């Protein structure tokens, strides 16, 4: 009998209308789940990956799930809380060291970065330029200022810097000037207002993506401190991983993937020697890289076009005597 059934409720893997998340099979293979292991899903979302981990855990296994989105936590409480193997924490994965449940060490950690499909699909969350809603973009709507509050407050130079740094938007200065000019007449409050303004000032080109794509990405990353949280979360995850534990990170754009790749390489590979500098201490690797960048198969892309930009990287913490 499966442990979920022993717990006296419907196995989460058999719940109706479960949508498989991106790189589902590859994530489970990368984590290499052991029956009595302890695993952390730092970006629960709607629980797709968490369900997969639970199907491979035995009665003594443990799954810790985190998310800073209260709607995601509500789903976790509803669907996962009855399972005694599951513990739930509302917060960013950057805070995982503050969660006492992680102190015993972890056999695997998963971060599925960026905005989730439910966040994009619900206009009221304010993430999508394709659906008009309040200009919010906060993953935790109870924390920090909204995108509207920020964009109506700061100078054009700061807006331009954010659009360039986090969106690699070449027209960042033009867009920033237009935003400031428009808000002097009427402050921004809706996603459609911002998307339409950006589209109106962008030069026509061959780019197939919506003109506001990069700007919305940049503002969202800034509002949610996504890259700073990622760097803190990577450090915390490696600290909590047991020797032999696996770290699996899914990223969706080059800024995230660059941070993940460089971080894993820095802990896995000795830096190149520099004759001009004093001899460095002997490099002791902390991680072993497990393969390279993993992307969705053609079959998955046909079923889920949003997986086209997903990149999975996996690393394993070295044994103490390795």
From Swiss-Prot:
Biological classification of the source: Bacteria, Pseudomonadati, Pseudomonadota, Gammaproteobacteria, Lysobacterales
Gene this chain is encoded by: rsmH
One example of a Gene Ontology biological process annotation: rRNA base methylation
Top-rank lineage group of the source organism: Bacteria
Compartment(s): Cytoplasm
Protein name: Ribosomal RNA small subunit methyltransferase H
GO CC terms in record: cytoplasm
Predominant cellular place of this UniProt entry's protein: cytoplasm
Function description: Specifically methylates the N4 position of cytidine in position 1402 (C1402) of 16S rRNA.
InterPro entries per record: RsmH, SAM-dep_MeTrfase_MraW_recog, SAM-dependent_MTases_sf
Family according to the record: Belongs to the methyltransferase superfamily. RsmH family.
Binding positions for S-adenosyl-L-methionine per the UniProt entry: 47-49, 67, 93, 112, 119
Recorded catalytic activity of this chain's protein: cytidine(1402) in 16S rRNA + S-adenosyl-L-methionine = N(4)-methylcytidine(1402) in 16S rRNA + S-adenosyl-L-homocysteine + H(+)
Enzyme Commission code: 2.1.1.199
UniProt entry keywords in alphabetical sequence: Cytoplasm, Methyltransferase, rRNA processing, S-adenosyl-L-methionine, Transferase
Residues annotated as signal peptide: none
Keyword DNA-binding applies: no
GO molecular function, one term: rRNA (cytosine-N4-)-methyltransferase activity
């Amino acid at each position: 009998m499966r442990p979920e059934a022993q717990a006296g409720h419907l196995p989460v893997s058999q719940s109706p209308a479960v949508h498989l998340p991106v790189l589902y099979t590859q994530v489970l293979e990368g984590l290499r789940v052991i029956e009595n292991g302890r695993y952390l899903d730092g970006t629960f979302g709607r629980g797709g990956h968490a369900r997969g981990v639970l199907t491979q855990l035995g009665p003594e296994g443990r799954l810790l799930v985190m998310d800073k989105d209260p709607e995601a936590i509500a789903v976790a409480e509803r669907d996962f809380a009855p399972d005694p193997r599951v513990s739930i924490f509302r917060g960013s994965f950057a805070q995982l060291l503050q969660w006492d449940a992680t102190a015993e060490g972890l056999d695997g950690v998963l971060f599925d970065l960026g905005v989730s499909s439910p966040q994009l699909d619900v206009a009221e969350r304010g993430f999508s330029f394709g659906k008009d809603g309040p200009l919010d973009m906060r993953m935790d709507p109870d924390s920090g200022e909204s995108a509207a509050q920020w964009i109506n407050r700061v100078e054009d130079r700061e807006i331009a810097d954010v659009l360039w740094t986090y969106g690699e938007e070449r027209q960042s200065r033009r867009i920033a000037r237009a935003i400031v000019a428009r808000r002097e007449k009427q402050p921004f409050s809706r996603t459609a207002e911002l998307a339409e303004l950006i589209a109106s000032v962008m030069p026509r080109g061959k780019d197939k993506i919506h003109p506001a794509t990069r700007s919305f990405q940049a503002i969202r990353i800034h509002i949610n401190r996504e890259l700073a949280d990622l760097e803190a979360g990577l450090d915390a995850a490696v600290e909590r991983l047991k020797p032999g534990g696996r770290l699996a990170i899914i990223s969706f754009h080059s800024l995230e993937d660059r941070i993940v790749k460089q971080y894993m390489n820095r802990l896995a590979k000795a830096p190149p020697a520099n004759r001009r500098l004093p001899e460095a201490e002997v490099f002791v690797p902390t991680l072993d890289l497990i393969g390279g960048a993993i992307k969705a198969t053609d079959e998955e892309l046909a079923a889920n076009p949003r997986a086209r930009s997903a990149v999975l990287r996996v690393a394993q913490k070295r044994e103490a005597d390795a």
